[in-house]
């Protein structure tokens, strides 16, 4: 009997985890439908020298030394150190959303993220362990700063309250970002084309710092999203109380928190709030137009901080970068490039292809890219950006019920689609909801490539995906018509009892 790849991988992982957890044979039939075994209420243990470690930042012990507004602010500054590490937002936790999708191509010359790309990873995969560890460093240390800030708040001076408000806002936003990244990677999408998966296993959430060797369990996906929304609303509230943010986009701002909340609501299929917060983010960031020429577009990726469309980016530059572990290296020396499929999706006059530059040694059959949005190892990650807000608003309004919603959807989509100079009117985007939605899905691929969102788009749309491209320059995939909405990465085995 012929066995499909999807059936085989389902069987292999089910059998593997049954042995790993020593489950009874009569339970096997209940988990064959999942790509990876996810156990609701799985017991996990925090390790003393692992992801629940605290950190001394500028000499301040975050367990005992957060005794004033300045120390809380400094502790939050320390959160960005964990957050921007290449183990997390600086590379692995971001790029894992693009590498295993139809947008990426691996030429086979190096062994970086190759198991992720080829779907041969196990629960012992180091990338998955690093993402988990550093995500929880952000979450746990954020909890410490939040708890300390809340205790100090009522007895603080008005000036110190403003300092605490900004610190608390950033801590809540960082924690929300980390939770969303982890639940996207280790949990099911909360909604898949209208179907609710809120009751599926999510991640470990706790409002309190988790002690070393404390036994904890997973919340549901729905509970995880509820906590993410609460954190982001708290962040926005504290930015409002402060009357301002730091005004530097290497720190979370009010606009960035609103933009992230718009993304969360999009995943939840809460169309009204997704559109509302996307527009609020654009308004607060004072963005009303985006680049439409090759020169304008290339300039945004020439150095850190010059991208006027970004709401939040990492403090990666000539002095602070990850060198060989950077995204620039991943998308060049480490063999990854835009897939032949993606390249064919761009029009001849699309300004976004102005950054598609190839190495002198590149050939059609063995492409060697020169970074794209990461042309050097010193180029930063732009994590929350204005074009995504226009696309969120377009998709949300497309699910509206009125002619005005449809018009607003096309107008928002047109802002981004005009990166292709040949597109000048909404009529070119489609005249029916289905046509416009199909265009929007492709536009998200074109616009958000290298921003780490493709995997979650394919899953939430319930696309029959093609993955593991090969045979460049032809459009070929090892696995086709794959129900990727059921794909969930395993929690690292080191974290499971």
Model-derived features with residue positions:
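Acidic, glycine-rich segments characteristic of secretory precursors and extracytoplasmic regions
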Residues: 47-97, 299, 487-497
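Bacterial Sec-dependent N-terminal signal peptides
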Residues: 15-31, 37, 41-70, 228, ...
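Conserved, well-structured interaction surfaces
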Residues: 112-186, 219, 237-240, 244, ...
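Short coil/linker segments at helix-helix boundaries
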Residues: 155, 159-162, 185-226, 230
């Amino acid at each position: 009997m012929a066995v499909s790849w999807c059936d085989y991988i389902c069987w292999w992982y089910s059998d593997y985890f049954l042995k790993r957890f020593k489950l009874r044979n009569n339970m096997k039939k209940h988990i064959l439908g999942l790509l990876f075994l996810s156990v609701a209420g799985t017991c996990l243990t925090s390790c003393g020298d692992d992801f629940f470690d605290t950190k001394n930042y500028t000499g301040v012990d975050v367990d005992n030394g957060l005794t004033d507004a300045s120390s809380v602010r400094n502790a939050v500054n320390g959160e960005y150190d964990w957050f921007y590490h290449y183990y997390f937002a600086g590379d692995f936790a971001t790029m894992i959303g693009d590498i295993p999708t139809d947008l990426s191509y691996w030429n086979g010359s190096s062994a970086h993220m190759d198991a992720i790309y080829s779907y041969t990873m196990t629960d012992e995969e180091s990338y998955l362990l690093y993402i988990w560890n550093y995500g929880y460093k952000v979450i746990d240390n954020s909890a410490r700063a939040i708890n300390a800030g809340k205790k100090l708040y009522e007895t603080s001076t008005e000036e110190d309250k403003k300092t605490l408000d900004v610190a608390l806002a950033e801590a809540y936003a960082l924690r929300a970002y980390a939770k969303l990244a982890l639940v996207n990677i280790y949990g099911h999408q909360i909604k898949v084309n209208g179907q609710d998966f809120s009751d599926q296993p999510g991640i470990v959430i706790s409002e309190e710092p988790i002690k070393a060797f404390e036994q904890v369990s997973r919340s549901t996906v729905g509970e995880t999203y509820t906590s993410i929304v609460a954190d982001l609303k708290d962040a926005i509230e504290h930015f409002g109380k402060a009357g301002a943010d730091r005004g530097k986009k290497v720190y979370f701002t009010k606009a960035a928190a609103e933009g992230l909340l718009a993304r969360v609501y999009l995943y939840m299929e809460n169309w009204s709030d997704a559109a509302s917060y996307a527009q609020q983010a654009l308004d607060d960031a004072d963005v009303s137009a985006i680049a439409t020429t090759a020169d304008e577009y290339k300039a945004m990726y020439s150095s850190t901080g010059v991208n006027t469309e970004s709401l939040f980016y990492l403090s990666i530059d000539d002095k602070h970068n990850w060198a060989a572990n950077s995204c620039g290296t991943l998308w060049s020396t480490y063999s990854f490039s835009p897939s032949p499929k993606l390249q064919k999706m761009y029009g001849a006059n699309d300004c976004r292809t102005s950054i598609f530059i190839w190495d002198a040694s590149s050939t059609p059959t063995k492409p060697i890219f020169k970074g794209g949005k990461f042309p050097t190892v010193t180029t930063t990650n732009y994590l929350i950006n204005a074009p995504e807000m226009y696309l969120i608003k377009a998709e949300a309004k497309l699910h509206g019920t009125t002619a005005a919603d449809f018009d607003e959807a096309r107008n928002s989509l047109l802002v981004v689609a005009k990166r292709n100079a040949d597109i000048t009117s909404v009529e070119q985007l489609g005249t029916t909801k289905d046509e416009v939605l199909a265009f929007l899905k492709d536009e998200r691929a074109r616009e958000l490539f290298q921003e780490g969102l493709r995997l979650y788009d394919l899953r939430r749309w319930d696309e029959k995906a093609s993955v593991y491209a090969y045979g460049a320059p032809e459009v070929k995939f090892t696995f086709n018509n794959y129900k990727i909405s059921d794909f969930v990465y395993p929690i690292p085995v080191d974290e499971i009892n």
